[in-house]
């Protein structure tokens, strides 16, 4: 029997990384919010890799932080190792990566949720969504509780009709053998939403007591304290190492001998997997010319013996998994604690969404995370934040919050999801961002904190820290620009000679000199030419000076890009009346309904000739 259980302004279904950000954003913006989860014990679960960050992902975590989200703060409290990767490359692709204590990550997020005003948590399975006149009206749980809402955010992860597969064994289930959301997919289909089926997988977890680390290469964290959040304290806590080993010819032969039992190759798995995180058996087959693959043995926390075998994502039968593991150096006597598996799940094709992450055909329904066809905790959290913000803004009858591709990796991802044809799990990569030199992890606060303040997510403490940083950067950069030396200056001549770099021929500022690869901002601090500021400020000054020319070029590119972005397309346009558009372009434009010519230009199937036709049509219409 269905009964009236209550009413909320915003309801969020699912409490993974997307759901937590959505619920916190909505509540912090003043909306009475309900977060519904199938298990309070699995809130902010890390069912796959125990890490946050990496290329493109670290930039996203920093963007979430700058806007007032939680992921960065949470991983700073719960990491067991943190380091910067890609240090040999430019700042556009350098990235933080932290190993998480999975249990502590869950507990820290749970604490934050419990302490958040205007946020309630309910453990239940939602099986139906009620609509009224094409708008979300209420949700109904399996036990009959009916909650009304003004906006609904779906962040169901891989639970929608989840199916676990190990060898020839399969059963209904969510990540880590939890219950799946069995009925909600049917409710979405009744709304007319188009669903697909994707697949992901996870490696086995092994007992650290059975590992011979002497046969592996230690991978320590950075010695200097690091942080994801711009406002976290810098703490130099004890770190746990990761370990590097490799598969070998024997390992690969075991896989090849058992392909007839691999569900990836027997047809048991129907869902489409991610290209950038293939199963181990897929790697062995696709890269048969390689004799070995890297495998990282990673701790899952400080108070557990479980370790994660990064790079060995598999759905091979359990006995084959054991044989594979025991062929790897250091794992000859290994014990499995949890078997690796594949999971299939339902997704909503994201072309059915607006840039606000609201469904085009169902008013008040927002979706975020793996339900939108993405992979990764960071991608999910970012979408959850945006969906939560826009759900709250809609309740307040305000305009949606939409970032541009030139402003954030978050925008690159959302824009890609809606405009590209997503046929496999989407992973954010630095190569997807046209303006990645502008979208660095170090300047996310400078790009986005003001926007977070405007929508009500950046509190006074964060705002004051941001303003102080801006002020220091301006003062110090001006000092470097106006402090100059001539060739006659002996102190400068000795300094440059000691750094094995050419002497100056004309008057040069410290700012200009810093462009030389031989010189570091810390050299200036050592000489007393610059104050010993916070490391974030010193890093920012150095990047701005060294890459000033390249940064200015990208800013010019952005100006050209924004000309098309600012050419808006009327929402009532009839593409059948736009003479000269290709048939495919008409079809795709009708589905996506782009808001601007810039967005239209990025739709798969819309070519430059179609854009020219569209521009001419809009100009003629404007002149009438």
Curated annotation (Swiss-Prot):
Protein name, as recorded: tRNA uridine 5-carboxymethylaminomethyl modification enzyme MnmG
GO molecular function: flavin adenine dinucleotide binding
Key words, A-Z: Cytoplasm, FAD, Flavoprotein, NAD, tRNA processing
BP GO annotations: tRNA methylation; tRNA wobble uridine modification
Binding sites annotated in the UniProt record for FAD: 14-19
Sections of the chain in a coiled coil: none
Binding site for NAD(+): 273-287
Family classification: Belongs to the MnmG family.
This protein's GO CC annotations: cytosol
Function: NAD-binding protein involved in the addition of a carboxymethylaminomethyl (cmnm) group at the wobble position (U34) of certain tRNAs, forming tRNA-cmnm(5)s(2)U34.
